[in-house]
């Protein structure tokens, strides 16, 4: 311990926590008298004012330091004397001034009218356009350029015994590894660093700057980039680290009283020699069972060490945040012993830097989303929403009077009529309409007569008029329909559509931002994020209710005998009672009206029918069957459409479910064979 510090410790032990020298103005205690004397200047009204700028201080050494740093050209040589002012002046305490020996022919400097701080010295990188205000940051940046000399090609990936071919790993003795080694720059590390070290010596104050430059040292370098530096205090000292056998395994770099140890074969940096020595052993000790780095001679039998080493060959980041992250990574590598076994569960980063756990969770989410449990029977809602449009001109519109029927685009091919059919019209599905010219028996077997498919003979000049019935429109909000029907069931039919239709207010952001305070002094506005969330929710509800179609609902139990098939199809969709009755008939028959599917199991049949009403991302090319599972749609197209055609031609049942109805003869019970009796053992 230094003597001054030891004496201070003795004073602290003698005087206790508080010193014996106490200031009578503020009560602060000091262990020494010099500390109290320096402290009393803070209470004195003495100030040192700079004549050339607005700088003011209370200590002489601070004033002299300011003159040397801020006004070096104005300071003249001369003895330092103590000048006393007259008693008439206000200053009661002496002021220190510098008396200059000025000759007659000396030029007097006038005070500066406007003072400006000198521009800070900028440190420019000789290898790129980066500029730094700190010398230490510039040194680290130049050191980061050396990893680019070892940057491996992007085509070569990491190493793994099990996934060597998938990730592109290479053995040390493989032909691809030898070929890449021969094509790689085979210069030594010292030769590769010649350009970098020469620029560091020129710009950061090495002794090599005074020596003449030799073109043979580095013929490929150029001096087009120069840095403006002015360093007097800090410098960089390098020293080679040599083994007993004469092999150079690294360099010691000293900067700002901090030692750094650099490996001569890779970008490894350490703060102690022992870590560098343990690291360099992986460069010289090789075996056939070891894995090697594709950018240097580093090898190890542990794949985890190889993966950690490959990360150091990546290009150095340039921003301050990533630079600090790199420093923490280097310190963590040096702190941990490389020979210490690491966690085997830790997996290396993939070639594209993706996280495997995130990919697994995403895959599980997608599989869960695609394979969600199907409900046995869904509630049948309104038909598929389409924009209201006039009926397609499939026939002459003057022949029919559709009455109050509102038409919309029908997705079901059963509701489409062929233009060329002027004879009695039949509405088969798309698959059977193609085979009309082949065989009449196939049409008779495949097409089923239903309520929506009847033969209607069209005669020109005859008009089909719907009976006059009162109508009402469904409100835009379906939730309000139940309460109105229960209380005013008779009055709804007499009201008009304009009176019954509710007016929906368009949501505005200002309505949710401003609120009525509970108390007078409470806040009158919500948080913008909360207001935006409420506005978006109201907007979605508005769009959902506003786009709900106003479909007419007719009275029930009305029979329309002479009704056009197109109008009847529209009427059946809008009349929910008849729609449910038709669906019940379809379920009783166990035969799908949109495709040739048949199944005796009601649960399986309902699951199939739901695919026709609830759309998916994949659609069958033969009908409106859709699902989010592509394989399910392909199986439906092949089994229900293509195989059913083959069964019809060959005279086989059109569905596998019909095979289940064939009684299976009971198996005749077989008699159990008697086990043979074991004979008695003979005596020995």
UniProtKB/Swiss-Prot annotation:
Zinc finger extent (C2H2-type): 21-43, 48-71, 123-145, 261-283, 291-313, 590-612, 618-641
Keyword terms: DNA-binding, Metal-binding, Nucleus, Repeat, Repressor, Transcription, Transcription regulation, Zinc, Zinc-finger
GO molecular function: DNA binding; zinc ion binding
Function, as annotated: Probable transcriptional regulator, which participates in the transcriptional repression of the presenilin protein hop-1.
Basic residues bias (residue ranges): 671-684
Descriptive protein name: Suppressor of presenilin protein 3
Deleted gene: phenotype: Loss of function results in a suppression of sel-12 mutant phenotypes, possibly by up-regulating hop-1 expression.
GO biological process, any: positive regulation of transcription by RNA polymerase II
Record region (Disordered): 337-359, 419-440, 469-501, 652-684
Origin species: Caenorhabditis elegans
PANTHER family: PR DOMAIN ZINC FINGER PROTEIN, ZINC FINGER PROTEIN 154-LIKE
Annotated GO CC locations: nucleus
Location(s), subcellular: Nucleus
Superkingdom of this protein's organism: Eukaryota
């Amino acid at each position: 311990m230094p003597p001054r510090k030891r004496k201070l410790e003795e004073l602290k032990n003698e005087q206790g926590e508080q010193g014996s020298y106490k200031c009578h103005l503020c009560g602060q205690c000091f262990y020494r008298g010099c500390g109290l004397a320096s402290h009393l200047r803070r209470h004195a009204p003495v100030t040192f004012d700079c004549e050339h700028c607005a700088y003011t201080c209370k200590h002489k050494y601070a004033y002299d330091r300011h003159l040397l740093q801020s006004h070096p050209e104005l300071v003249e040589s001369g003895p330092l004397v103590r000048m006393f002012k007259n008693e008439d002046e206000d200053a009661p305490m002496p002021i220190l001034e510098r008396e200059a020996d000025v000759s007659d022919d000396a030029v007097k400097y006038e005070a500066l009218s406007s003072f400006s701080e000198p521009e800070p010295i900028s440190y420019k990188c000789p290898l790129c356009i980066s500029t730094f205000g700190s010398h230490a940051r510039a040194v680290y940046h130049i050191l980061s350029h050396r990893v680019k000399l070892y940057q491996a090609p992007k085509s070569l990936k990491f190493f793994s015994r099990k996934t060597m071919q998938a990730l592109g790993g290479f053995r040390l003795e493989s032909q691809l590894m030898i070929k890449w080694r021969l094509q790689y720059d085979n210069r030594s590390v010292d030769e590769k660093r010649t350009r970098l070290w020469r620029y560091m010596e020129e710009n950061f104050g090495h002794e090599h700057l005074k020596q003449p430059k030799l073109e043979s040292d580095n013929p490929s370098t150029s001096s087009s980039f120069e840095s403006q530096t002015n360093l007097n205090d800090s410098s960089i000292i390098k020293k080679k680290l040599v083994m007993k056998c004469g092999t150079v395994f690294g360099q010691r770099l000293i900067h700002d009283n901090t030692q750094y140890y650099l490996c001569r074969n890779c970008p490894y940096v350490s703060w102690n020699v022992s870590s560098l020595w343990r690291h360099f052993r992986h460069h010289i000790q090789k075996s056939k069972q070891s894995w090697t780095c594709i950018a240097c001679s580093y090898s190890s039998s542990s794949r985890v060490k190889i993966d950690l080493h490959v990360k150091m060959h990546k290009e150095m980041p340039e921003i301050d945040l990533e630079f600090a992250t790199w420093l923490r990574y280097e310190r963590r590598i040096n702190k941990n012993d490389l020979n210490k076994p690491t966690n085997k569960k830790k997996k290396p980063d993939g070639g594209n830097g993706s996280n495997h756990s995130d990919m697994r969770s995403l895959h599980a989410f997608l599989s869960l989303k695609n394979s969600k449990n199907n409900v046995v029977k869904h509630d049948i809602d309104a038909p598929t929403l389409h924009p209201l449009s006039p009926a397609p001109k499939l026939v002459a519109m003057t022949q029919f009077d559709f009455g109050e029927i509102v038409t919309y685009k029908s997705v079901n091919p059963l509701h489409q009529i062929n233009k060329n059919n002027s004879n009695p019209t039949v509405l088969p599905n798309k698959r059977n309409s193609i085979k009309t010219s082949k065989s009449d028996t196939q049409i008779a077997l495949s097409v089923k007569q239903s309520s929506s498919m009847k033969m209607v003979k069209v005669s020109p000049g005859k008009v089909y008029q719907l009976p006059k019935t009162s109508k009402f429109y469904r409100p835009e909000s379906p939730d309000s329909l139940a309460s109105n029907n229960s209380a005013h069931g008779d009055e709804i039919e007499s009201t008009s559509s304009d009176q019954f239709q509710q007016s929906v207010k368009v949501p505005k952001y200002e309505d949710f931002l401003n609120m009525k305070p509970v108390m007078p002094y409470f806040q009158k506005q919500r948080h913008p994020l909360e207001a935006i969330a409420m506005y978006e929710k109201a907007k979605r509800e508005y769009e959902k209710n506003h786009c709900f179609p106003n479909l007419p609902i007719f009275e029930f139990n009305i029979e329309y005998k002479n009704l056009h098939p197109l109008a009847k199809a529209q009427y059946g969709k809008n009349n929910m009672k008849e729609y449910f009755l038709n669906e019940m008939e379809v379920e009783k028959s166990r035969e799908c009206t949109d495709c040739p599917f048949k199944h005796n199991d009601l649960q399986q049949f309902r699951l199939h029918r739901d695919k026709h009403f609830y759309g998916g991302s994949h659609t069958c090319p033969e009908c409106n069957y859709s699902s989010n599972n592509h394989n399910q749609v392909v199986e439906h197209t092949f089994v229900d459409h293509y195989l059913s055609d083959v069964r019809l031609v060959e005279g086989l049942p059109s569905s596998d479910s019909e095979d289940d109805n064939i009684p299976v003869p009971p198996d005749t019970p077989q008699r159990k064979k008697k086990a043979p009796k074991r004979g008695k053992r003979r005596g020995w």
